[in-house]
Amino acid sequence: MSGESVIEFTGFIKACRLFRENRLAEAEAVCTNLLRKNPLDQATWALKMQCLSDSTYVDELENEDMGLAETFLDQNVIAPNARPGTSFARPKTSAKGVNPILRPTTNAGRPLSGVVRPQSSFKSGSMDQAVRTARTAKTARAVSSTSARNMRLGTASMAAGADGEFVNLARLNIDKYAADPQVNRQLFEYVFYYLNDIRVAHQIAGTASKAAGFEDYYWKNQLAKCYLRLGMLQDATKQLQSSLEQKKLIETFALLSKAYNRVDQPMAALKTYSAGLEVFPENVTMLTGMARVQEALGEYDESVKLYKRVLDAESNNIEAIACVATTYYYGGKPELAMRYYRRILQMGVSSPELFLNIGLCCMAAQQFDFALSSILRAQSTMTDDVAADVWYNIGQILVDIGDLVSAARSFRIALSHDPDHSESLVNLGILKHREGKIDEARSLYSSATSKNPYMFEGNYNLGLVSFTQGKYHECRELIEKALAAFPEHEHCKKILNHLKPLYESI
Amino acid sequence: MAKPVNVNQSKWTVPVLLKECEIYCPSTCVAFGPILSDNDSKLIIAHGGHRGVNMKLKVFQQLEQLSESSLADMPTALVHFINDLSSIPSIAVAAGPSLLIYKNLKPFYKFTVPSSAINPTESEAWKAVVNKKINGDTLLTVLKRLEDDVAFSKLTPISQTYLRADKETQVVLVEHYGTKIANSATITCIAKLTKSTAEPLDILVIGTEHCEIFLIDSQAFTILETIKIGSVPVNICAYGTYDVDYRLFVQTRASLIFCMKRGEADYQPIVISQSMITSMVLVNKMIVYTTVENLIHFASFRGKKMNTVKCPSKIKMLEPFIYPLKQLAAVIAVFDKEIRMYNEHYLLDTVQYEKPLAWVKYGCYGREDSTLVVAFKDGSIAIQIFRRKANFDTKLDYNQVPQAHALKLQIPKKTKVFIDLTQREVQLGNRIHKVYQKNLFDVKYRLAASYLELTSSASATVSTTTVLPVEISVDIHGFGPTFRMTIHLLSSSKQNLYDMHLSIISDPELYDFDTPLIPVHLLASGQSYSFTTLLYCKDPEKAANCDVRALLVHAKRATPIVTAVIKMPFSEFPLD
């Protein structure tokens, strides 16, 4: 056995192979060594930039984090008083009979979706509300104008610069490198993803696009990404449309729809997605995007139909499975929802939320042996951010079982994990109310409504207490708020009808 | 005067009052039909007058009274019928036990219902009193005894009157009627039935107080059939022809409706109503009847209830409405100041009047096929015509239920998985229960453990002890690096709480506080207190954040009373 010699790669080839095998850190180390020997080696330089930017790569399509300022100080919205159903801000009227009692809502007053995504926490209401409530405790929502993810990306560059920053942007001749088609893509991605310096990235993309004679769709897309990050949505739309004329790409369609969503034009976004579907039939990205928009508009039937199409195309799409499961659960078929959640479990996801959902489905489908064990599992694996929800659901189950003392305790534990958990506050209030401690119940309801003013239950229950105590004025205000969340609620209307003659008689 | 309220949409023309007339009569004493040689349909009314005075048979043409003739007895019902194909039709007025037949508005014949058997004791007593063998008082005692023995209604009309009359009248009664005592029953209702389609003669159907129904040949006035039923008939509706097949629907005083078919001998009620039936008509092969509970029932000829209308107020009477040109059929229900038209599914029309109504009659008047004669309580009579362009396109659901009630519950279908799971429950019930009990114990154990931890550390925003029920909530205002922290405290304990402190704790590397320890001298029950402090983020560039805790502590307690844990937001960079 003599002739067999192991081929040992060295130098740039080695770095390339390591990069191919996605061993980014090792590839980067090799590049660093090479650059020490020859700092002017452009190929190595580019490869190192590629390694660095790949390590912090974020799918720009899913990056929906918006800060407080972007959410509320938004001058991009075209129609402030949109017709119902054509705006995310006014989905309520077209939400076909969605009953907040049957399908609970989030803090922002939207019905729960199957998955948590930044988009689903779009906030309706005033900025004042957001400033006051959002930051009192642990919420996932970024409150300041800088969102958590961008912050982390920005800090990454500082940590890396142990022996000096790799590329010093201030001293880099941007015009020269940006015009060089050999390295400009790597440079752009490095600046955009790794350094997170959008202004420079925009400069690079602009120069590169010009150098390519405004003929390169790639640079148009990159420019659009920069504009999206900078909040210049009109420019982003223009770039993307021009890019689509040159080449039809999935990414372009998706980015264009995203831009439309940001300016609150869901109908235009839907149109773009369907145009994309014509070019790329049954494409998962398009279908998922459409489904999300429909869900945000309150068209659950449409949304679930689209998610089912997603599942036909890609049967392991977790978002689609979860959304379909949620719909089944709230549609009164928990046993089917359980099957879907079990499928997610089989695909290797095991989060406390998933176990909790399986537990709740089992409970609703009367599979008591699995119900409690799944919930126990969720409880033992839960992280701090879901602890309140887990305890709240344990409380709900204990209410179902009939152990009200334990239920009250578990709501209290939920509140210790998240003092803003308004559902727990309301349910604790109801339990106190049953015990006859009206004042305690009242204070619990009122803190629930102050923490989540869009909540139907809190407003309604507090309204009821006020009604029985004869505080009619307060009651009317609360009931009107409750009706805003659930316009069809019969009892609210009855109470208002009771109050009307009292007002008229004065 | 009697204008309907909304004229524009009305299906009826504006009512026109008849000139100079004042009519008081029940709705049974009204009929339409040609009675003179001009073949024009007239309005015939048997006017009841006042207490037996001024009883008249009146005939109207157009808007004027054409003629009137006196009536000898109080009319109960009136019918217009054809008894001779070659000559003009006649009128039959039921008064007491007799039918008075008028032809060409002149008295023509008097038919009296045959007398039933008189109780022998009764007739003997009367004979005796006429022959002066006994006096009036003895007669009274005999009759009273008879009343207890056989029942009041079984006595002859004259005995009934005698029992209820005062002394002087009794003497007069004996003088006038004592010799010719008869037991012919009073006619309660009258109807007509066509003999056959080829020979359009009418058969008269009359019901009497003696629970009998007679079918009378109107040519020779011979009784064709006698039917005995169990209750007093008060209203008869006839359907079909006598020679081929007919049905008589008889409403009785006992709130039963009987159906009599040709060739059947045994009559059972087809409708047995719990509440009193007030009116009955036939529309479109349906029996429509009303009860005192303000309900209109639509029933099939077999008595099966098809639909029920709930009306807002008392229904005075029903009148059938048939408009053959457009094949419209409905029932007119008369209320106090309005009429409503219903069919078996919908409310079709409502007409309102300014005066209370007495009755309405629908039929052919003059040359107009569909005329409605409306009589008011004050005696005036108005005439309305159904517009030729009117239709029943706008329909309203009667029994309008609120929509929430009309919605059906969406009960999900049973899935196969559900059935499988149920099967599993049946097979493994025992084991499922055991596992469930064990897990429930586990859940409760963990809950207890967590709660114990919570109470011992008092890291809750709502106090867990019942001795010191205090609630805390914290707001953070600002974007950084300077934040304002506002702490709200609310005590719901019975006594005021004294001498406590609010302590604010966090990582000293990250935040600086203006006042880390705030004295809380007094917490009055039910009052909300707020305390404020500024906090500075030392190094926003680090972009780190950590929890800040606000504790309410008391010098004599080892653990804090309540705790608020706040996750601080990322700080903005300072504005320079």
Curated annotation (Swiss-Prot), chain A:
One of its GO terms (cellular component) is cytoplasm. TPR repeats lie at residues 217-250, 251-283, 284-317, 319-351, 353-385, 388-421, 423-455, 456-489. One of its GO terms (biological process) is intraciliary transport. It comes from the Eukaryota. It is found in: Cell projection, Cilium; Cytoplasm, Cytoskeleton, Cilium basal body; Cytoplasm, Cytoskeleton, Cilium axoneme. Expressed in head and tail neurons. Expressed in ciliated male tail-neurons. Expressed in thermosensory and CO(2) sensory AFD neurons. Disruption phenotype: Mutants have normal body morphology, but with reduced body length and width, delayed larval development and decreased roaming movements. May exhibit defective chemotaxis tendencies. Defective sensory cilia structure and function. This is characterized by increased accumulation and mislocalization of intraflagellar transport proteins and impaired movement of intraflagellar transport proteins such as rab-28 along the ciliary axoneme. Disrupted assembly of the BBSome complex at the base of the cilia. Keywords: Cell projection, Cilium, Cilium biogenesis/degradation, Cytoplasm, Cytoskeleton, Protein transport, Repeat, TPR repeat, Transport. Residues 83-112 are annotated as: Disordered. Disulfide bonds: none annotated. Part of BBSome complex, that contains at least bbs-1, bbs-2, bbs-4, bbs-5, osm-12, bbs-8/ttc-8 and bbs-9. Component of the BBSome complex. The BBSome complex is thought to function as a coat complex required for sorting of specific membrane proteins to the primary cilia. The BBSome complex is required for ciliogenesis but is dispensable for centriolar satellite function. Required for proper BBSome complex assembly and its ciliary localization. Required for cilia biogenesis and both the assembly and movement of intraflagellar transport proteins along the ciliary axoneme. This is Tetratricopeptide repeat protein 8. It comes from Caenorhabditis elegans. The lineage of its organism: Eukaryota, Metazoa, Ecdysozoa, Nematoda, Chromadorea.
From Swiss-Prot, chain B:
It comes from the Eukaryota. Its main location: other. Disruption phenotype: Mutants have normal body morphology, but with reduced body length and width, delayed larval development and decreased roaming movements. Defective cilia structure and function. Keywords: Cell projection, Cilium, Cilium biogenesis/degradation, Cytoplasm, Cytoskeleton, Protein transport, Transport. It is found in: Cell projection, Cilium; Cytoplasm, Cytoskeleton, Cilium basal body; Cytoplasm, Cytoskeleton, Cilium axoneme. One of its GO terms (cellular component) is cilium. GO terms for biological process: cilium assembly; intraciliary retrograde transport; non-motile cilium assembly; protein localization to cilium; protein transport. Expressed in ciliated cells including amphid and both inner and outer labial neurons of the head and in both phasmid neurons PHA and PHB in the tail at larval stages L1 and L2. InterPro entries: BBS1 (IPR028784), BBS1_N (IPR032728), GAE_BBS1 (IPR056419). Part of BBSome complex, that contains at least bbs-1, bbs-2, bbs-4, bbs-5, osm-12, bbs-8/ttc-8 and bbs-9. Interacts with bbs-7 and bbs-9. Component of the BBSome complex. The BBSome complex is thought to function as a coat complex required for sorting of specific membrane proteins to the primary cilia. The BBSome complex is required for ciliogenesis but is dispensable for centriolar satellite function. Required for proper BBSome complex assembly and its ciliary localization. Required for cilia biogenesis and both the assembly and movement of intraflagellar transport proteins along the ciliary axoneme. This is BBSome complex member BBS1. The gene is bbs-1.
